[in-house]
Amino acid sequence: MPKMKTKSSAKKRFKITATGKVKAAAAGKRHGMIKRTNKFIRDARGTMVLAEPDGRKVIKNYLPNGL
């Protein structure tokens, strides 16, 4: 059976740390920021580490060979 390919969209959206955790950008930042709190805007900057079950799903389904 051939090797499963890494999804191109996942390559652009996720990074795997040295310890195997998955980093991604925070959601909800595209538009409508005027009604968000300053704390939400501040916390949404940069990247965040996904929860362990979500990270496992991303690696299994979208990044089978890592990055």
From Swiss-Prot:
Family stated for the protein in its record: Belongs to the bacterial ribosomal protein bL35 family.
Any Pfam family: Ribosomal_L35p
Keyword Disulfide bond: no
Taxonomic placement: Bacteria, Pseudomonadati, Pseudomonadota, Alphaproteobacteria, Hyphomicrobiales
Gene Ontology biological process terms, A to Z: translation
Protein name as annotated: Large ribosomal subunit protein bL35
InterPro entries per UniProt: Ribosomal_bL35, Ribosomal_bL35-like, Ribosomal_bL35_CS, Ribosomal_bL35_sf
Domain of life: Bacteria
PANTHER family: 54S RIBOSOMAL PROTEIN BL35M (PTHR33343), LARGE RIBOSOMAL SUBUNIT PROTEIN BL35M (PTHR33343:SF1)
Protein keywords: Ribonucleoprotein, Ribosomal protein
Gene: rpmI
MF GO annotations: structural constituent of ribosome
Species this chain originates from: Rhizobium leguminosarum bv. trifolii (strain WSM2304)
Gene Ontology cellular-component annotations: cytosolic large ribosomal subunit
